[in-house]
Amino acid sequence: IDPTGPTGGSFLAAIIDTPTLEERWHQGGYVGYAITTVGAFAFLLAIVRVIMLTMMGAAVNSQLKSGEAKANNPLGRVLLVSQENPNIDTETLELKMAEAVLRETPKLESGLTLLKIIAAVAPLMGLLGTVTGMIITFQAITIFGAGDPKAMAGGISSALITTVLGLLVAIPTVLLHTVVNGRAQKIMHILNEQATGIVAERAEAAGN
């Protein structure tokens, strides 16, 4: 559009009247604020879990290089079960090792379910805000009429803000869930691998 043309003045006025990001955010209303709060919580939760799992992973890697099982890391606690039960049969040891791995699972997977729920609920909250905003817009049209297309378009635009916010929360949360889950599963794989190896060694020794 040519700013110097016949419609240039209207175009420039539209640019000037374009809401800022903060104003757009406020247009989302209470639902928008709730979505933002949920998103901030998901981000903080994911960061905390990544830090915790990184520390656990470092401790597990250190345990792999150590000949002495220590109770300050998940793998060490699993290995201690074998050391504390040197004379039990292979089947019982396998059950005890599986139980030890299961005891560590909740600590490793903590927060994953919550992140998944937030990723699913955020778009629905956005849709709720949009539907509510559309209802308010059409109620206003019913009362005041549709004589001003700009007002109608502005109301619809404001209603759609919550959908955008919901997606802006859901998409990063899905990615964060994938990262956190990947780190947790990596540690779980090491625990299962080491537990299976110990049971296999015990079974081989018993066979000899």
Specify the residue positions occupied by each region the protein language model found:
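Alpha-helical transmembrane segments
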Residues: 37, 41-45, 128-131, 135, ...
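Residue-level signature of catalytic and energy-coupling elements of molecular machines
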Residues: 29, 43, 79, 126, ...
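Pore-lining and gate-forming transmembrane alpha-helices of multi-pass membrane transport proteins
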Residues: 36, 150-181
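Hydrophobic alpha-helical transmembrane segments of multipass membrane transporters and ion channels
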Residues: 30-37, 110-127, 161-169
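Extended, hydrophilic extramembrane loops/domains of integral membrane proteins
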Residues: 1-16, 88
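Hydrophobic alpha-helical transmembrane segments
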Residues: 23-62
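Predominantly long cytosolic amphipathic alpha-helical stalk/bundle segments
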Residues: 54-146, 175-208
